[in-house]
Curated annotation (Swiss-Prot):
Classification lineage: Bacteria, Pseudomonadati, Pseudomonadota, Gammaproteobacteria, Pasteurellales
The protein, known as: Bifunctional NAD biosynthesis protein NadR
Pfam family, one: AAA_28
Membrane topology recorded in Swiss-Prot or TrEMBL: Peripheral membrane protein
Region spans: Ribosylnicotinamide kinase: 225-421
Length: 421
């Protein structure tokens, strides 16, 4: 039952008026109720007109960008634009060929998919999701910028129609785009920080020299740039202490070994209850720690133990490898892997059982065998001196942060120096 758009009674009000006219006594009383019903209907129409008027007056803005990657300059522009409109639509533009070239010319660890870029934007603006809307525009087949404005504008207008919004203003930081926006989209153009006075950064600068512009990369995009350094070795090889030292010195994050926490939380602190089905749970818990460390890292994140080590323990204690761990090893590679030789003093902390020299050597060989099997390049630190190990790993990290080549260090060992201390 819909309301009428003209001045005649709504059917429900007409029926109510007829009812009152039939069952209420005098003519004057009937006229009074007809008049009352008419007034109510008139008030409703005025209210409806006010709502429609407000809807028409709503100011809608739009922003276009590749966001490859998104950075704080983009975020600032979006929030400034949002303060000037009632509703803002952010369009993430993609072109398969162009985006592939951008990736190959970058220092990004892996190529972000369209879904990755949409996810960045949706995560950043999730608390304004009813006012800031994220859309995707496919630009494949359209001549490259700055050409192709006519074809591009037609695709944009189609998107506006499909997503049911009509912007009146477009926001941009590129002065050269003002005239084309006005000509091809017929929209008012507002330039936001065109001289880069507040945020002197661009996606191009971040792609090519990410560490130099690290402070401009939001945590959502950092996993595509942050370096991960995995420190692995057998029991009591000094991994955890070394990881903590490195994270503190380089002012960044680390991911602790989740397996120890799993034993305390799920097994009551005793590994005798460990079983084959526990290893995937430990790997998933460790991956959560790694994800958090990378997202909040300062250029580099240190990882205490990798999935190859988890697989080695599974083989050692359960007599066979786990296919889930095999998948984790392949799916989550690390940028740098450092293997500590198992030649430091063995300390029994209640969760260790491979304490004999023979057991330690056998486990070390198993780690090397698995590293070779999965074709993981690694740097082996042989010195039993904790100080030497610390300084040698620091030297590797300095090379990584300076974006120097470390391939000559991989699959080699540092010379033994000093004694255990």
């Amino acid at each position: 039952m819909g309301f009428t758009t003209g001045r005649e009674f709504h059917p429900a009000l007409r029926m109510r008026a007829k009812y009152n006219a039939k069952y209420l006594g005098t003519k004057s009383e009937r006229e009074k109720y007809f008049h009352l019903a008419y007034n109510k209907h008139t008030q409703f129409l005025r209210y409806q007109e006010q709502i429609m008027s407000k809807t028409k007056e709503k100011k809608v803005g739009v922003i276009f960008g590749k966001f490859y990657p998104v950075h704080t300059g983009h975020i600032n522009m979006i929030y400034e634009a949002f303060s000037k409109v009632d509703e803002l639509h952010v369009i993430v533009c993609s072109d398969t060929v162009r985006d592939l070239k951008l990736f190959y010319d970058s220092k990004m660890k892996r190529m972000p998919t369209v879904q990755d870029r949409l996810r960045w934007m949706q995560q950043i603006f999730k608390y304004q999701k009813n006012q800031i809307f994220i859309h995707h525009l496919v630009e494949d087949g359209i001549p490259s910028y700055p050409n192709g404005w006519q074809s591009w504008s037609e695709a944009v207008k189609t998107l506006f129609h499909e997503k049911h919004f009509e912007p009146s203003i477009v926001f941009s930081s590129e002065p050269q785009d003002k005239a084309p926006y006005e000509k091809y989209l017929g929209l008012e153009v507002s330039l936001v920080d065109p001289d880069r006075t507040f945020f002197n950064v661009s996606a191009t600068k971040i792609r090519t020299t990410p560490f130099q512009y690290w402070k401009f990369i939001p945590k959502e995009a950092r996993p595509f740039f942050a370096k991960t350094v995995a420190i692995l070795g057998g029991e009591s090889s000094g991994k955890s202490v070394l990881v903590n030292k490195l994270a503190a010195v380089f002012n960044t994050t680390s991911a602790w070994e989740y397996g120890r926490e799993f034993v305390f939380e799920k097994l009551g602190g005793d590994e005798q209850a460990m079983q084959y089905s526990d290893y995937p749970q430990m790997a998933l818990g460790h991956q959560r720690y790694i994800d958090y460390a990378v997202r909040h890292s300062h250029k580099i994140a240190f990882i205490d133990t990798d999935f190859i080590t988890t697989q080695a323990f599974c083989i050692q204690y359960e007599g066979k490898a786990h296919p889930f761990l095999d998948s984790m090893i392949k799916e989550y590679p690390f940028d740098v892997t450092i293997l500590l030789k198992n030649n430091t003093e063995w300390v029994d902390d209640g969760l260790r059982s491979l304490g004999s020299q023979k057991q330690r050597q056998q486990f070390q060989q198993l780690l090397k065998k698995l590293l070779d099997k999965y074709k993981v390049p690694y740097i082996e630190i042989e010195s039993p001196s904790y100080l030497d190990r610390y300084n040698q790993v620091k030297a590797v990290i300095e090379k990584v942060l300076n974006e120097e080549e470390i391939s000559e260090l991989q699959n080699t060992t540092f010379p033994i120096k000093g004694t255990s201390q």
